[in-house]
Amino acid sequence: SNYTTREDLYNLAENGMIERRRRAGSLVARRSPEQELVTLEIPDIGLAIGGRDRAYSYRLLHKALREPDAAIYNEVALAGDDRLFAIDGVHLADGRPVGVEHRLLNAASVPEGLQVDFTLTSPGTWLLQEVSWTRGEYRITAEGASEQDAEVLECAPGQACLVIERRTWRGEAPITWARQIFLSSEHELVARFTTGGR
């Protein structure tokens, strides 16, 4: 529900894990030396759904090898001088849509991705199993479903959703950017933290 999403984001902000900014959304907070080390893992969505005793499946909606859109900074930054492999799909639990995923792969960093049959496995699962990465970045927001995403999610436009944008790199080479839109009642974020021995 919208209340649950707001409450979760409030709790993350209260614990210093995210910064909430008017008109900019919620961003992962910068860590000062005095703060705890907080880790958000990259989850395998299929395993997470299966862990709740639900049957997971992924449906590929669209894939294309293309040039980056010069007007979109994230695409240009991800592609550099290379092309992008765009993949759109939907995550399902017990046959019902719970999340839409829009993903871009740097075709030069992950050329083997062009040969993968994403009707058999989700891009996220394949990446976690086959592609090493050294650093990542999260951006987590609460948003209303767009008309296009609402149609795929079988919900009303504007329904509360948890939106996760994630980028990963191997060294300085960009690997992937993903935007995942989940129905707010269908996804959770789990963070583990330590106090640094204090």
Feature roles, as predicted:
Residues 1-29:
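N-terminal helix-turn-helix
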Residues 19, 50-51, 77-80:
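Short, charge-rich binding segments
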Residues 20, 41, 119:
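Short acidic-hydrophobic sequence patches enriched in Asp/Glu that either
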Residues 27-41:
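Short, cationic-aromatic polyanion-contact patches
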Residues 45-47, 121-122:
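Acidic/proline- and glycine-rich, intrinsically disordered low-complexity segments
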Residues 47-56:
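Histidine- and aromatic-rich ligand-binding microenvironments
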Residues 57-198:
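C-terminal all-alpha effector/ligand-binding and dimerization domain
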